[in-house]
Amino acid sequence: MKIAIGCDHIVTDVKMELSKHLKEEGYEVLDVGTYDFTRTHYPIFGKKVGEAVSSGEADLGVCMCGTGVGISNAANKVPGVRTALVRDMTSALYSKEELNANVVSFGGAIIGKLLLFDIVDAFIKAQYKPTEENKKLIAKIKHLEAHNDKQADPHFFDEFLEKWNRGDYHD
């Protein structure tokens, strides 16, 4: 099974430890970045994880930023992706078993590393339990998706990166 992982610069160290853990558990890891602590934008990596899962390049995905909020929202914008921002085992299992979530997101600065590993392991092993009600709920979620051709452009974030490089954004 191949797991796509991605993060922003705030939690690169946590992502690298998760990558090592997943490999030790026997999973193939597709690391879409970021790879260092140079300031970057979480939507880039949420989108990359989402696209890897949506295209079938990866079976499941894990996203992380400081709080998990931004990157989970970015991943959820990719058609075919159902991302759950979780901080506990119950939410992670519910998202996979009932809503067939295919990406799980975390606040790497919020949740402890060992709990994160346990949740990711359980999320990967959990099985979707299809029921008529679950199928209807997922169909309603899928109906909300609208394909945006601009979003598929690999240069979608270039404008924002140029602004960052000019110093238009400040922490």
UniProtKB/Swiss-Prot annotation:
EC number, as in UniProt: 5.3.1.26
Keyword Isomerase assigned: yes
Family annotation (InterPro entries): LacB, RpiB_LacA_LacB, RpiB_LacA_LacB_sf
A GO molecular function held by the record: galactose-6-phosphate isomerase activity
A Pfam family the protein falls into: LacAB_rpiB
Alphabetized UniProt keyword annotations: Isomerase, Lactose metabolism
GO BP term, example: lactose catabolic process via tagatose-6-phosphate
UniProt keyword annotation of Isomerase present: yes
Pathway terms, separated by semicolons: Carbohydrate metabolism; D-galactose 6-phosphate degradation; D-tagatose 6-phosphate from D-galactose 6-phosphate: step 1/1
Recorded superkingdom: Bacteria
Catalytic activity: aldehydo-D-galactose 6-phosphate = keto-D-tagatose 6-phosphate
NCBIfam families hit by this protein: lacB, PRK05571.1, PRK08622.1, rpiB_lacA_lacB
Family note: Belongs to the LacAB/RpiB family.
Complex and partners: Heteromultimeric protein consisting of LacA and LacB.
Protein name per UniProt: Galactose-6-phosphate isomerase subunit LacB
Gene source species: Streptococcus mutans serotype c (strain ATCC 700610 / UA159)
Upper lineage: Bacteria, Bacillati, Bacillota, Bacilli, Lactobacillales
Protein's gene: lacB
